[in-house]
């Protein structure tokens, strides 16, 4: 309400949830006007490094290791459903991604083609299947952000047929770019361009 006096554009803030403590703070967030929560299923294990939690009066982010396990995802979805909030999802299975990246490094593969093959569309579909089951179990709306593959879309269609409440979006780079036609790492994103 206070921000409406100073801004000309409608906006909303969602909270990213990585830890049990943050799950415990979801009610507080909702009370403060945050009405959606985001999870990063691509973060955990060997690929669990993230910058987060900028301390008050600081301009530096804190580096942290997180593990967004299936159990954590289920708790987040359950809490969000009880609060009547959607869950925004970065859908990639972190364990599969970690294995894919390790294999690419062992083979000395590099570049965008290695990045794409190490984070297979199957890993995206696997995460979609996991979170959608929880969405159905707890009657929670699932909002997939930046879907990056046909296989992910096909899995989403299957999950919708099973009754999952789903919204989907993508980004222009998934519609217009391919790793074969890019140089360097300017198009290195997650999920990767195909």
What do these predicted ranges mean?
Residues 21-39, 43-194:
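Histidine/acidic residue-rich metal-binding segments in metalloenzymes
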Residues 1-6:
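Metal-associated gating/positioning segment near the N- to mid-region
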Residues 14-18:
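A metal-dependent hydrolase metal-coordination microenvironment
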């Amino acid at each position: 309400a206070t921000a409406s006096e100073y801004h000309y554009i409608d906006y909303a803030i969602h909270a990213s949830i990585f830890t049990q403590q943050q799950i415990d703070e979801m009610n507080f967030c909702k009370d403060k006007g945050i009405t959606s929560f985001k999870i990063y299923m691509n973060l955990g294990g060997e690929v669990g490094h993230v910058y987060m939690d900028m301390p008050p009066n600081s301009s530096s982010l804190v580096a942290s290791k997180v593990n967004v396990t299936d159990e954590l995802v289920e708790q987040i979805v359950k809490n969000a459903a009880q609060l009547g909030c959607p869950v925004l999802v970065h859908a990639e299975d972190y364990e599969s991604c970690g294995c894919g990246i390790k294999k690419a490094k062992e083979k000395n593969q590099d570049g965008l083609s290695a990045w794409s093959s190490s984070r297979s569309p199957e890993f995206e579909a696997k995460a979609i299947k996991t979170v959608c089951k929880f969405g159905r179990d707890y009657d929670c709306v699932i909002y997939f952000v930046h879907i990056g593959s046909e296989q992910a879309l096909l899995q989403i269609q299957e999950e919708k047929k099973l009754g999952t409440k789903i919204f989907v979006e993508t980004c222009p780079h998934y519609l217009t770019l391919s790793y074969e036609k890019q140089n360097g790492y300017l198009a290195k994103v997650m999920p990767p361009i195909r």
